[in-house]
Amino acid sequence: MSIALSSLIEATKEDEGLLRQILSSFSCNKDEDIESFLHSRAVEFESLSKARTYLICDENQLMETNFCLDQIVIYGYISIALKILSVPYDVSNRKRKEIDGLSAKIHGEQIKDFSCYLIGQLSKNSSVQNNDISGAELLQAAYDVIMAAVDAVGGRYVMIECHEKEKLMQFYAVNGFEEISHIADGKCPMVQMIRKIANA
């Protein structure tokens, strides 16, 4: 099950040390930025409504401990936000129309910017022994949150931004994402990938 960080903040408002303890139990040995975000920035992003973060936990384990906060085990986490996808000029009008749903142009000009749901963070907890939660399960948790938003306000595409690494890009490709653009980021180039939301 997923626990909204906003709910955890509310539950620990009398004990900020407990909140820090829970969040600091997460580690990611593959990407320090993912770990740092949860430890240092997720709460601020939550308060500013820049992103919503969800902790993935074991519902049975929570019930066994009577939802005791200091015994929460984080198996993974996801963060979701809204973001504008700026499509490169070399992307075809056919693709632009597919993304927009109606047209490739507005007032005779190519549509360049599209609103998307961004899965900004997605990772399992390296510090949990025998943590068998899969990337596909984390993606499904993200989709569940996004679909609730889609039902309320609409939306056509989900976007991710990941390091330009073959294994990582292949994971997202297998799960329905396609490359749309690249981001120059010094020594760590990034790629943007998108996936159409079902029934959009």
Regions found by a protein language model. Name each.
Residues C162:
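His/Cys-centered metal/cofactor-coordination and adjacent catalytic loops
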Residues M1-N130, E137-M159, K167-A200:
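Non-catalytic substrate-recognition and accessory regions of acyl/acetyltransferase enzymes
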